[in-house]
């Protein structure tokens, strides 16, 4: 049975404080809340981390760079994550996938931003039209790690250590060699004890590991190579070599 109902405008309209419309939905190769793809590195690697997609003009107006950490803010909450340029979106629009909750991303995911309004007949929530603003975030101390082997066990052990970070993202990647990938950031360096815990759980605390430390800048770098291949690495303090090292892996 079809019902011919009168059009009703979205509950939340754009305004000066929240000039962007946030849309959300699923990605092709992720399964709902990742109950399946969250355990399969080959599937997870299709899109490794939650990204806020924005039109390039909107990014330029806010002086945002592709991959930069941003704060997405609505009337109900806020979320930190990287921004991604996507000119298939119209100016004034932004998109954030539904799949990432607080298991793989610090925070409550996109539902911390959406509104509770729903269609009076179908009861479908109004998840496609939340007013938001996006601004650059300065988190000077950054962290990146990649480690092969026992990815689920490592993830369960490492996840609690990042509760105090302003931003933390966890993902799986790899086809023949599954790996856990971690990206995090905060205002101040964590304690030496916490960093030692991270190194131990990443398998970077002993053995044939290349090490570089600059205590004055709170910078540390670790790379484990086995049989001519990178099998684990961490960059703490600054992560400029992240993409290059990941390509070598």
Give, region by region, the residue ranges found by the protein language model.
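Generic detector of well-ordered alpha-helical segments enriched in charged/polar residues
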Residues: 3, 195-199, 242, 246
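Long, low-complexity segments enriched in small/aliphatic residues
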Residues: 1-39
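Structured loops at beta-to-helix junctions and adjacent beta-edge loops in soluble globular domains
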Residues: 3-7, 23-26, 99, 137, ...
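Histidine- and/or cysteine-centered catalytic micro-motif in compact active-site loops
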Residues: 25-27, 57, 75, 235
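Flexible, glycine-rich terminal cap/loop adjacent to redox cofactors
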Residues: 212-249
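A generic local secondary-structure boundary/capping motif
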Residues: 9-12, 121-123, 221
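Long, contiguous, secondary-structure-rich segments that constitute the structural scaffold
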Residues: 17, 33, 37-53, 57-205, ...
């Amino acid at each position: 049975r079809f019902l011919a109902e009168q059009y009703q405008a979205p509950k939340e309209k754009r305004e000066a404080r929240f000039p962007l419309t946030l849309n959300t939905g699923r990605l092709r190769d992720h399964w709902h809340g990742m109950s399946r793809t969250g355990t399969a590195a080959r599937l997870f690697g299709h899109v490794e981390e939650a990204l806020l997609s924005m039109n390039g003009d909107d990014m330029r107006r806010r002086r945002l760079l592709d991959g930069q950490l941003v704060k997405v803010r609505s009337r109900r909450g806020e979320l930190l994550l990287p921004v991604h340029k996507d000119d298939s979106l119209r100016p004034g629009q932004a998109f954030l996938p539904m799949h990432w909750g607080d298991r793989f991303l610090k925070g409550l995911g996109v539902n911390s931003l959406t509104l509770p309004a729903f269609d009076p007949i179908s009861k479908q929530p109004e998840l496609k039209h939340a007013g938001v603003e996006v601004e650059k975030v300065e988190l000077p101390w950054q962290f990146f790690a990649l480690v092969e082997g026992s990815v689920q066990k490592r993830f369960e052990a490492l996840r609690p250590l990042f509760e105090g970070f302003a931003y933390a993202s966890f993902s799986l990647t790899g086809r023949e060699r599954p790996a856990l990938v971690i990206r995090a950031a905060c205002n101040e360096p964590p304690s030496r004890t916490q960093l030692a815990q991270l190194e131990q759980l990443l398998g970077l605390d002993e053995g044939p590991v290349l090490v570089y430390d600059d205590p004055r800048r709170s910078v540390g770098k670790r790379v484990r190579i086995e049989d001519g291949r990178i099998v684990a690495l961490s960059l703490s303090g600054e992560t400029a070599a992240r993409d290059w090292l990941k390509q070598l892996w």
